[in-house]
């Protein structure tokens, strides 16, 4: 993941829906002045398991959480391009069918000695490639991630560990039961 942090801050409840976007960088509400533009991937395998990364605060490995692959946009790339690039860098998975934007959230959180303010878009993606091995982690990512894991919806719902966005288990269950929303769901902002 380039651009240092991947957006480890929490996300919370549904605030409503907004217009659809193809992830090409077009508007989906206000971008938020000064917010880092981030693309994240809700990657599902043929068994509908979701791939999550395990991260932690570099100076405090006991402060850990699970989160979706993704990171900041580079140059003039679109959110969809960033999603695919970040997924390849962080998981080694390149055989992917990228789908629609499912959710969007604004978050602000402390990580590695600074505050991160992010505007995150979550893309649905499918793959049959289940072996995941990071190929191009930044120095910060190497100091703050410990691996990847495929989770079933039931495992995620029963997890006692911290997972971001905080409603991911509920959001995944809804996605699997109802399919992608007609327009991206805007999650309530969360400041940690």
Q: What does each model-found stretch correspond to?
A:
Residues 2, 101-102:
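Local beta-strand/beta-hairpin segments that build beta-sheet-rich folds
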Residues 35, 75, 79, 164, ...:
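Hydrophobic (often cysteine-bearing) scaffold residues that line and stabilize catalytic clefts
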Residues 35, 66, 103, 148-151:
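Tryptophan-centric aromatic hotspots in well-structured domains and transmembrane helices
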Residues 166-192:
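Charged phosphate-binding loop/patch that engages nucleotide di/tri-phosphates or the phosphate backbone
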